[in-house]
Curated annotation (Swiss-Prot):
Keyword Cell inner membrane found: no
Annotated localization: Cytoplasm
Catalyzed reactions: UDP-N-acetyl-alpha-D-muramate + L-alanine + ATP = UDP-N-acetyl-alpha-D-muramoyl-L-alanine + ADP + phosphate + H(+)
Keywords tagged on the record: ATP-binding, Cell cycle, Cell division, Cell shape, Cell wall biogenesis/degradation, Cytoplasm, Ligase, Nucleotide-binding, Peptidoglycan synthesis
Pathway(s) of this molecule: Cell wall biogenesis; peptidoglycan biosynthesis
Name recorded for this polypeptide: UDP-N-acetylmuramate--L-alanine ligase
Signal peptide: none
Any one GO molecular-function label of the UniProt entry: UDP-N-acetylmuramate-L-alanine ligase activity
Assigned protein family: Belongs to the MurCDEF family.
Gene: murC
Described purpose of this protein according to its UniProt entry: Cell wall formation.
Any Pfam family: Mur_ligase
InterPro entries attached to this UniProt entry: Mur-like_cat_sf, Mur_ligase_C, Mur_ligase_C_dom_sf, Mur_ligase_cen, Mur_ligase_N, MurCDEF_pg_biosynth, UDP-N-AcMur_Ala_ligase_MurC
Amino acid sequence: MNAATKLPTQLGPIHFTGIGGIGMSGIAEVLLTHGYTVQGSDLKPSKITERLERLGAKIFIGQVGENLADAEVVVISSAIKPGNPELETARARGLPVVRRAEMLAELMRLKSNIAIAGTHGKTTTTTMVATLLDRGGIDPTVINGGIIHAYDSNARAGAGEWMVVEADESDGTFNRLPATIAVVTNIDPEHMEHWGSFERLKDGFHEFVSNIPFYGLAVCCTDHPEVQALVGRITDRRVVTFGFNTQADVRAVNLTYKSGVAHFDILLRNEGQVISGCTLPMPGDHNVSNALAAVAVARHLGMKRDEIRAALAGFAGVNRRFTKVAELGGVTIIDDYGHHPVEIAAVLKAARQASEGRVIAVHQPHRFSRLASLFEDFCTCFNEADVVGISDIFAAGEDPIPGASRDDLVKGLIAHGHRHAVAVPDEDALEALIRAEAKPGDIVVCLGAGTISTWAHNLPARMG
């Protein structure tokens, strides 16, 4: 029995189908760190698979039944569907098949856990909680949904008693995670293909916070009306609220931005104290809000005000969350994962705060179904951008939906009053748009969950 995980040490090779996925790889890395034999497959090599290989994992490119070899357990994510050759082989051999969330729950079982949930901001908030606890000497284990710049990984195996995890609501499995502290950043209609209705999604979040033990804590953002409504439904559990509103227990005040750095004070209402002179080296009210969630957790775990102030000031960020790719002739290129209208609006507001020049947004819509169901919101979320470029939709396996195309969105933006929206069909068109529109002092924000990140990172070579 492994002392750290209480999983049997004699457990043979653990095979991850889709090991390069951001959710799967973190679990694989923690298991590797604890001495388990880990192997896995993915459809193509990546920096993540290369890192896991360096840590000792055996990596297969492509997915065939023979990859399982002498594996004794197979871990899959919700993206792995019936018919996958490795899944079918595992079942034919009678091997245990474990969902990603189930394996994560096993790792969490004998730790005290902080689980961060919400439609937006999970990854950044998870990173901030990890950063603060690391700085406070709590030495947490971390499994995140994005690459933490300070670790150059989405995972960290700590020696402390606390684990920090990103809790993904997309398939409902976040309710299997044994959270001691449950954080909710916001609740918006998303992942309706699983939940079916917004009411069911809200019930899922209620179950998430209701699952905490009597000695646990719910940390909730009451700036968001649906989260405030959730707080009203929580009974018999401790709740700490955060936000900019006057009623919040942990509240940011005196917020200003200078050269893309947030300056603010934090009121700790329940303690009657202030953490003054805080800085966060990234723009965006939403990022300050995420920081407040981390501060609420840190104070609950006994961190000192000076430790919190220093940790926020040194926050190194997370990959694809307002990540600066390059500065080309005085034009800043930003790569961001934002693909929901709420996220896009928040990122563009942050870009406006960070730049004295114009904001040029280039967005790759992610999934036809998302664009179709939120079309009106997509048509109005780019108001902070002076210029908007829209690429072809990243289908993620979906079939096209009438009325939800690149050109439909461009027309919708113009019809809703945007002054400059154009189609950007390929990387050549992106380069041409930047050369024509961007001037020194401007900021170009590439937004989306698909291949737009590659476009952004290719710009320095193309523009050079």
